[in-house]
């Protein structure tokens, strides 16, 4: 299973690569609606039935992936395949993963529905842009799941799935280019601890900030502000170090806001502002980072800095 490695991005760059993830096997299209003369795959996800494309948006979502049977026939076929495998001593989840992991059962993987849930709600139906990426979905179905498991899905949101696609489930289809699968504890442990903060104090501070970002209202990772937040949560360690510093100064995290940067021109750049309020004096300190969300893969433009209200 892939383990996340957060990187220190001291210089703004678009080339930061998660050490746990391999590169996408296909190019990413533009996120805008296309004219009739444009290529068929640019700016739109393919319809589930192979019909016309529809305007779509980028997705950078945090949640959990689960596999479901779209029909009784697929479920029965899976049961027969399970009977051919050596699954003695395994629980149902482990046996499920064993069957899916075998190359000869890849035809079953293609038949399954892979649903992404966010905060317990069914949010997206996942399909790979490249068929080779079905392996990423199999890796996300862990043999020994934990409540702290987390999946990051990066792709493009298309139309709502027809009811016959996944046993009546009608949620937007996301054609993904990359999936990271890890657990929250591994993410926190991969963050270098600030010199003046003990590991005992740092871990709870980082966990609280991460949970606050995850639990923000309606964060399905499809809006630009949520994509920027989710990107920072899993790819930029400085926000956790800064949170630990403020907590050590007896301050509370009171808000996380996003706004369009005045630096936006041809590119769409958002400012993510973190507000901390001192518990004794009620003095508010703010810091922010700029994130470019123009294309499918967000990237850091300005590292974390003090923020002053205009």
Q: Locations of the language-model features?
A:
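Exposed acidic/polar residues on beta-strands and adjacent loops within beta-sheet cores, strongest
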Residues: 37, 199, 242-245, 254, ...
């Amino acid at each position: 299973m892939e383990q996340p490695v957060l990187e220190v991005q001291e210089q703004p760059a678009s080339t930061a690569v998660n050490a746990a993830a391999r590169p996408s096997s296909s190019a990413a299209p533009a996120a805008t609606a296309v004219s009739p003369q444009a290529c068929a795959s640019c700016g739109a996800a393919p319809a589930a039935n192979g019909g016309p494309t529809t305007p779509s948006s980028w997705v950078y979502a945090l949640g959990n992936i689960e596999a479901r049977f779209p029909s009784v026939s697929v479920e029965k076929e899976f049961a027969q395949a399970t009977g051919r495998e050596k699954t003695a001593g395994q629980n149902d989840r482990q046996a499920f993963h064993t069957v899916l992991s075998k190359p000869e059962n890849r035809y079953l993987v293609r038949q399954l529905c892979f649903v992404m849930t966010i905060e317990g709600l069914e949010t997206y139906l996942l399909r790979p842009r490249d068929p080779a990426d079905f392996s990423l979905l199999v890796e996300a179905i862990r043999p020994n799941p934990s409540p702290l498991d987390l999946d990051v899905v990066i792709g493009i949101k298309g139309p709502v799935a027809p009811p016959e696609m996944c046993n009546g489930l009608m949620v937007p289809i996301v054609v993904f280019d990359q999936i990271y699968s890890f657990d929250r504890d591994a993410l926190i442990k991969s963050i270098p601890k600030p010199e003046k903060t003990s590991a005992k104090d740092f871990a709870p501070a980082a966990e609280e900030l991460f949970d606050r970002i995850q639990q923000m209202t309606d964060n399905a990772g499809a809006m630009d502000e949520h994509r920027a937040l989710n990107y920072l949560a899993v790819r930029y360690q400085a926000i956790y170090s800064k949170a630990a510093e403020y907590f050590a100064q007896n301050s509370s995290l009171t808000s996380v806001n996003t706004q369009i940067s005045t630096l936006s021109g041809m590119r769409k750049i958002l400012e993510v502002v973190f507000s901390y309020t001192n518990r004794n004096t009620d003095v508010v300190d703010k810091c922010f980072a700029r994130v470019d969300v123009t294309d499918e893969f967000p990237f850091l433009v300005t590292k974390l800095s003090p923020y002053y209200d205009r």
